[in-house]
Amino acid sequence: MHVNASAFILLKICCGDGAVTGMEQSIKPRSEGASRPPVGPERQNRQRRKEKDMGGEAGMGLRVRASSLLLSLALQLAVALVSVSAQHKFGINYGQIANDLPEPAQVATLLQSMGVNKVKLYDADPRVLTAFASTGVGFTIAVGNEDLQAMAASPDAARRWVAANVQPYVPATRITCVTVGNEVLSGNDTAAMASLLPAMRAVHAALGDAGLGQPVAVSSAHSVDVLATSFPPSSGAFREDLAGYVRPILDFHAQTGSPFLVNAYPFFSYKASPGGVSLPYALFQPNPGVRDPGTGLTYDNMLYAQVDAVYAAMQAAGGRADVGVTVSETGWPSRGDDDEPGATAQNAAAYNGNLMRRVAAGQGTPLRPAVPVDVYVFALFNEDLKPGPTSERNYGLLYPDGSPVYALDAGGPGPGGSLNPYYTSMFSSSSSGSAVGVTFLTEKVVLSLLLQAIVILRRSYSYC
């Protein structure tokens, strides 16, 4: 197997120069490589102690089997993410409310190895933006709710923010969108609500004045609870108490060409009423579907029904039909408290895997079948410092050490499946294009597997 130079860089990041030297020797033909250096007494003693703690040879065998399982999980996750992100509609939320996350440079390497090409932050962390320079990954960065009133009151505040958080990083880092506030209209801070649109306008003007040479969209993320009604989707409508805020925001989106962002979690609906919400309907699993009497359309999953309810609400509020909807957050927790039914790794794998299959296939909603759904999955890592119920700390696809929380199957058993991103992204084009896709995917998977192998070795043997 050809080992890309990036693999050595990745290994060096995690384990140091000695590990790179050892790997270089291990992949040489035996006739070319030097003989294996003797293992010192201290390392031998340390290894014997580890074997004793694990129960001798049986324990070592258990470690090997555990390592094989983790590598299998890593392979499935890598294939899933590479396959989906190749369609340019898959993004991931990179939250950092944790004390055990890897350095941004390591995250950049990890996401590149998985083929993720869109990332959404909840701030404008300079370490992250610097680490992702020249990677080609598109970033959505954020203005915090605490800054809205200052920006609404003074255009200079918005200019200073752009000068500090955007200009130093472009064009090396691709910043494609700025979200101004998060779920502001769902709170009770009327001053922040009144400041939201003026702050959005100020940031948009500041970006234009900065002369960046590239378009940067301005939007704000809203919870789906800004809707007064969401089912049937055709009856979607915004809450009356928010109408005075929402209509001008929709006009802003129509004027600037930016999307309306919505955070939508079918898990919350299922958690609130497990007896009234079909779990297969929430998880994109086979189910009879639900017919919308207003349009005659049938919905086989809750997320797409929620998206179409937002479209209907926008139309009812006088919004233009050309304003798009982006799902800025969605996901499913792998763990929860006793009063959080459905929060399991199995359900999380089903939700995210089935969603990614549809995204990779370019599937639209029943109301807008020709418009692929733009999605940011929540989240990249489990975040151990998030407040609230256990589920809040367990939305991650990955543990902080980079190992998968669960096996994620965004593909399928073969090319016959209608929503099979592995075959869609790799084999649906011409033969020459497919060959390029296979080479690209193989390299990405190798890098991802290498990272996982490093993590496993560090856990098991402390060689690095």
Task: Annotate each predicted stretch with a short phrase.
Residues M1-L62:
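Intrinsically disordered, low-complexity basic segments at termini and long loops, enriched
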Residues G55-G59, D409-V445:
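C-terminal GPI-anchoring signal of eukaryotic secretory precursors
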Residues L62-K118:
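Boundary/entry segment of secreted carbohydrate-active catalytic domains
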Residues Y94-V162:
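N-terminal carbohydrate-binding/catalytic regions of secreted carbohydrate-active enzymes
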Residues A133, A163-D338, R357, T365-G388, ...:
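Active-site region of glycoside hydrolase catalytic domains
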Residues D337-Q346:
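Histidine/acidic-residue-rich catalytic or RNA/ligand-binding cores of hydrolases
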Residues S434-C464:
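Cleavable C-terminal sorting propeptides in eukaryotic secreted/cell-surface proteins
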